[in-house]
């Protein structure tokens, strides 16, 4: 397509028709399983504290708010969906727009479509099985394989990520010619993420989707810490053909612990010169009121459709990428 014809969609019309069919198939998948489709706000007065996520910010200046209200476009519908769960809605899913002020490229667009769903009374493994069912149905792929985070590092880097110190992690990075980055990095989790991205991801999910589970407890985010091994979190990610597709948790339900994690995130943000973010008190109040034991997962629809169609880029499956918006 001509670079000058920016009024035209980035994706072909046949691809958009196939995308619509996949969206309908996903809705049938959940309807058949009795999971309620919901809609939640795209904007909130609070946002994520995660140091790796960068939300878009806007300002409401309507009647009665002459001073204005800061609002953030949602990076995920997670917080609002958990409030619905605490209110007793039962299992829910959502197909929605999410926004992240970060990368743009083959696998990234600042505005993207997210599939997120939550299953009360599911543990992490049961939800992983359901994700696998969905992937097999949409992608017509083989059943997934599963590796713990520890097993993945031991297999591909010959190092134990749960016990290795920073010197050992830097030595592993040197074998990947990453010393220029690793030698000046003091944060252990950043070193682990560097090794995972460069030393593990290229080797997994080539022939079938691969679940990586039991991430280090320091990377728990909104997941519970394992009661069987306090070094790891009940968190998983899914990779297929070089693409990260999904990120799931056995959800943390303790409001006090969640608040402590948010505050710790903001301390890390301050140490890195990043703005501290407003904590979502409504979410904490919902957790305090009683979030049911549940597991949840977020899956990138644009990436899923890209894989299903054998496309080379998100631009091939999105009507208008940000450069044509």
From Swiss-Prot:
Belongs to the class-II aminoacyl-tRNA synthetase family. EpmA subfamily. One of its GO terms (molecular function) is tRNA binding. Substrate binds at residues 76-78, 118, 251. This is Elongation factor P--(R)-beta-lysine ligase. Keywords: ATP-binding, Ligase, Nucleotide-binding. The keyword Endoplasmic reticulum does not apply. InterPro entries: Aa-tRNA-synt_II, aa-tRNA-synth_II, aa-tRNA-synth_II/BPL/LPL, EpmA, Lys-tRNA-synth_II_C. Homodimer. ATP binds at residues 100-102, 109, 244-245, 300. It is an enzyme of class 6 (ligase). Gene3D superfamilies: Bira Bifunctional Protein, Domain 2 (3.30.930.10). Its EC number is 6.3.2.-. It catalyses: D-beta-lysine + L-lysyl-[protein] + ATP = N(6)-((3R)-3,6-diaminohexanoyl)-L-lysyl-[protein] + AMP + diphosphate + H(+).
